[in-house]
Amino acid sequence: MADLRITGADQFAAVAKELKKVGDKELQKELYSAINRATKPMRAEAKKSAAANLPKAGGLNKRVARARMSTRRRTGKNPGVKVVATGMSQLGLMDKGRVRHPVWGNRGRWVNQPIPDAEGWFTKPMEDGATDVRREIVKTLDRIAKKLARRY
């Protein structure tokens, strides 16, 4: 749903490739846990945003706030870090300010309902926190690159 492109993507790819090549599981773990730590505040802000901005009637805001949010990292040809919300359908649609649901009393008929207050409930916290996450990841990459240079 949200994709953070770190400015040091080439550096991320190079460090990740080197870590795989030398097989240093300790440094890999350090890198991945640093990425998870860096994105944790953004995930928490997205949950708060869901609780505050999505419709409270029917408990939609609480159900979405309980959705699983995880950090995924790619180290192949397109390196990057992605924060993803899963566990419920229509999360992306809700982020665009809409929800699709059956009509009360006629479950066979579905409608698209606008929820303008919900627009950006996920992307806004991601965009707001992206700079801090990038900075933290680049610092971690520098630290790990130095450790790799000393060890190998």
Residue ranges and their predicted role:
Residues 1-80, 104-152:
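Short, Lys/Arg-rich flexible segments
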Residues 75-103:
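Mid-chain, well-packed structural core segment of small domains
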